Structures are given as C-alpha cells and as structure tokens.
Amino acid sequence: MSKLDLNALNELPKVDRVLALAETNAQLETLTAEERVAWALENLPGEYVLSSSFGIQAAVSLHLVNQIRPDIPVILTDTGYLFPETYQFIDELTDKLKLNLKVYRAGESPAWQEARYGKLWEQGVEGIEKYNEINKVEPMNRALKELKAQTWFAGLRREQSGSRAHLPVLAIQRGVFKVLPIIDWDNRTVYQYLQKHGLKYHPLWDQGYLSVGDTHTTRKWEPGMAEEETRFFGLKRECGLHEG
C-alpha cells in the first residue's frame, strides 16, 4: 500500500474518494488493529489525533492507539451533561494510560443553551440535531483545526449499529483521513482485549448500559432492544461526530 495524498483525494467527489480508497481498504481489512494503526502512522500525514467519548468500551482504542503512539492528542467533546461516572472514568483512564487529553466544549454553557433554546433534546430529531451541532460537531471541528489534524483515529465498530455496519477502516471525513482500527471487532474481542490488558468497561456497564452518552439521552438496555435504541430515544444513533 502506497502513501495517500490527502489534498488530491479531497478534491474528488465523495463517490470517487471511496473508490480511490477501495484497494487500500481491502488490504487494511486483512491487518490486525495494531497493524492498521502502525500503517496509518507510517503512510498517512500528521498531525495525528484520537477521539473518544469515554463510553462503555473506550479503554480499548485509548490503550491500543496510545501504546503505539504515546502522547497522541485525545479529543473529548464535553457537553457538560455526561454522567458523573463518565467524568470519573475519564480521570481514571487519563491517569492510568497517561493520556494527552484535550477537552473541547461549546461556546455556550449548558445553562445558557437551555435559557436560549430550551431543552433541545426534548424537541424531536431537529432539536437533537441542533444540540449535537452545538455540543459535538462544532467543538470537534474546532479541535481538528486547532490541533492541525490530518489523520483522525476513532473506536467505532460495525457491530454497534446499522449506521456503522458498512463503515470502512479508512475514509475521509471533515477533510481529514479517518482510521477505525477496531471497526471489525465483535463484543467478544473487545472483552478479551480488556481482560488481557487489565482494563475495565465504563462503570455503568455493570448497571445495564450498553452505550453511554449524555444523561438525558441515554437509556439502560432492556430485553428486546437493539443497542442503538438506547441512545437519543431511538430516533437516531449518531451524535453527528461520525456522520458526513
């Protein structure tokens, strides 16, 4: 696999970009997660960043990428509405893995947003999308720009939802390369990795949560529910960071 020209690929229509990356993706599918990270660091341009929501399985990608690229900036978009257990988990993992954590937030505080717009998450899909744009998308775009990112690692997996079922290992999103090293991992592989490296699931895993985001748009899993139904009242799966 040869080095890829980000500027040249960004000039192509989206469909042509996908086709241009198809051969590389076919080869990346045959590699291990660790090999994918190593390949990206050797063949894709820096600066490099890793994003994390510090969700249920976050320790996996944080450990995997950070051990190969120590001190890689780890981007967290903090809405101000995360669970107390999530903030504690962030502190625990940051200390344990010696993460180079970079926290980005909306320009308006949660209280100010509620004063201006009301509780956006109670205003249907349109309200949720506006909430995500303010609290997730804009801060992430700012992070990528300020950190001069050209290659972005994330811990998405196909098994998590229908919207992620066909994602490739390598794509271009928001004008940068996006690498998903554990995209093809199943729950068993995640569990085995955590066990092997002495890592933990998010604290709310033991309370029945399969996916964790903000307190007001996250539900415990109940029999018969798909994982994606535990977020955003089942109206949508993605918070906007991994769309587009």
From Swiss-Prot:
The keyword Transport does not apply. SUPFAM superfamilies: Adenine nucleotide alpha hydrolases-like. GO terms for molecular function: phosphoadenylyl-sulfate reductase (thioredoxin) activity. Its EC number is 1.8.4.8. GO terms for cellular component: cytoplasm. It catalyses: [thioredoxin]-disulfide + sulfite + adenosine 3',5'-bisphosphate + 2 H(+) = [thioredoxin]-dithiol + 3'-phosphoadenylyl sulfate. This is Phosphoadenosine 5'-phosphosulfate reductase. It comes from Salmonella paratyphi B (strain ATCC BAA-1250 / SPB7). The lineage of its organism: Bacteria, Pseudomonadati, Pseudomonadota, Gammaproteobacteria, Enterobacterales.
